[in-house]
A protein has these predicted regions:
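Serine/threonine-rich, low-complexity intrinsically disordered segments
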Residues: 16, 22-24, 175, 222, ...
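N-terminal regions of proteins, emphasizing targeting and processing segments when present
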Residues: 5-8, 393
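Short, composition-biased motifs enriched in small/polar/acidic residues
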Residues: 359-434
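Short hydrophobic transmembrane-like helices used for membrane targeting/insertion
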Residues: 1-4, 18, 41
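Residue-level hotspots at or immediately adjacent to binding/recognition sites across diverse folds
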Residues: 41-362
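Bacterial N-terminal signal peptides
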Residues: 28-40
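Bacterial N-terminal signal peptides that target proteins for export
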Residues: 8-29
Length: 434
């Protein structure tokens, strides 16, 4: 069994701190500024059974990844005359399903897709593939390698994962039909979990359990959680375009230790809320910093949850979910409209689902412009709303400084000057206030 299979077995066994109403999250590399903006959320949801691949009774389906067009990739099991059932990769788009023509891996990251419907795939033999424009291609491995796997991709089509090699498992990037070693420091095994549109990498390294890193513009940053003990471990699982990462940590090396979901937004990871019994795990996130996974409540009781605005939504027990006959939901990914995909039992059969809020976060665009004396932050306001801009040098700070009195919205562009500051990084939040 290879290390990635061991990681998947462990995951099968076993939020930002401020409540601000915002609508997006962006990072300015030039100024090293993080802007967190959230929009209104809704308590009403609709759940859709994505259906089967084929129509043989007893088939199952699962969903792994969703893009911002609402398209979903996952797997469906089909029966072939004279042979056992096979698990195929499926793309659900615009009310239709498409068999991508490759046997699926049972891995928790069987496939990922971007907004262009490029699909990165792990097949059943640990051979990475890419499906693009209707064509399926096998991705190359490092010299001397016999197997590898994908974990993520960005809007530019860069795919990340791992490849075997004579020197051990290496984190790699595929782009344009070539494979490149990320050059990460040595270890018994390492793999890249995600890459954002700026090229930032999220990497795990198997050493004393797992250690996690972000590689930003060639600089390696060790991801820490303040509550992790010296013999604890971290495991990053996803990354967004604001440079936020989500993952998990525990305080004991080993398969039996309790895992806890966390969010990295600069500095130490912030543990995400849990039930009193403790234990949780994150699987995916969107560009708003919202995270999906599960929260452990008791034996055989781990509801699917969506973490946002410092709290979590119990997806498994939404009235709409229960009324539709669903149970045992497992949430795997979330897009920027807070649409959640995964799988659960619908009327007793395993099915892929799409869970959509009735009201989605409202797009909220912010622009940063460098100037000789600092920068200007600007955004389009809504008439009747009031906005406040807060700032700090560290996202885990308890107190944030206001840049002035609340600003009344007028339906026009609001521009706020940000003076120069000696700090290497400064963070800002734009929020609506009463």
């Amino acid at each position: 069994m290879n290390p990635v299979e061991q990681l998947d077995e462990r995951r099968d066994q076993t939020p930002p701190p401020m409540k601000t109403r915002t609508a997006g999250s962006r990072l300015s590399a030039a100024l090293a500024l993080s802007l967190s903006l959230f929009g209104p959320v809704s308590a009403q949801w609709t759940i859709t059974d994505l259906g089967l691949l084929g129509d043989a009774d007893g088939n199952d389906s699962q969903a792994w990844s969703i893009n911002n067009r609402g398209h979903v990739v996952g797997s469906g099991r089909i029966l072939t005359p004279g042979s056992a059932a096979q698990l195929h990769v499926v793309l659900w788009a615009d009310g239709r399903q498409r068999d991508l023509g490759v046997n699926a891996s049972s891995s928790l990251t069987g496939a990922k897709l971007n907004d262009a419907d490029v699909v990165a795939i792990n097949d059943g033999t640990w051979k990475p593939h890419v499906w693009q424009h209707g064509l399926l291609s096998v991705l190359p491995l490092l010299p001397g390698a016999s197997y590898g796997g994908i974990h993520g991709l960005n809007s530019g089509g860069q795919i990340v994962g791992w490849s075997d090699s004579p020197a051990g498992g290496r984190s790699v990037i595929w782009h344009g039909g070539t494979v490149t070693d990320t050059g990460m420091m040595g270890g018994s095994f390492m793999w890249a979990m995600a890459i954002n549109d700026s090229g930032t990498l999220a990497i795990n390294r198997a050493v004393r359990g797992f250690n996690s890193y972000l590689v930003v513009a060639g600089t390696t940053n060790f991801l820490t959680v303040a509550s992790v003990t010296p013999d604890g471990t971290t495991s990053v699982v996803d990354l967004n375009n604001a440079g936020q990462a989500c993952g998990n940590f525990n305080n004991h090396v080993g398969q039996s230790a309790a895992w806890h979901a966390c969010l990295w937004t600069g500095g130490d990871g912030i543990p995400l809320p849990e039930f009193p019994s403790g234990g949780s795990e994150a699987f995916g996130m969107n560009n708003l910093g919202h995270v999906v996974g599960y929260a452990y409540r008791g034996p055989y009781d781990a509801p699917a949850v969506l973490w946002r605005d410092g709290a979590f939504v119990n997806l498994s027990e939404l009235p709409e979910v229960l009324a539709a006959g669903w149970s045992s939901l497992s949430a795997r990914d979330v897009n920027d409209s807070d649409q959640v995909v995964g799988h659960g039992y619908h009327n007793g059969k395993l099915r892929a689902f799409l869970l959509s809020p009735a009201t989605v976060p409202v797009p909220f665009h912010v622009t940063l412009r460098r100037e000789a004396t600092g920068a200007t932050l600007s955004f389009v306001s809504s008439a009747g709303a009031r906005y406040q801009v807060l700032t700090t040098t560290h996202l885990t700070a308890t107190n944030w400084d206001s840049l002035g009195d609340p600003i009344p919205g007028s339906g026009q562009v609001i521009a706020t000057h940000i003076p120069s500051s000696p700090e290497t990084a400064r963070f800002f939040v734009v929020r609506t206030v009463p």
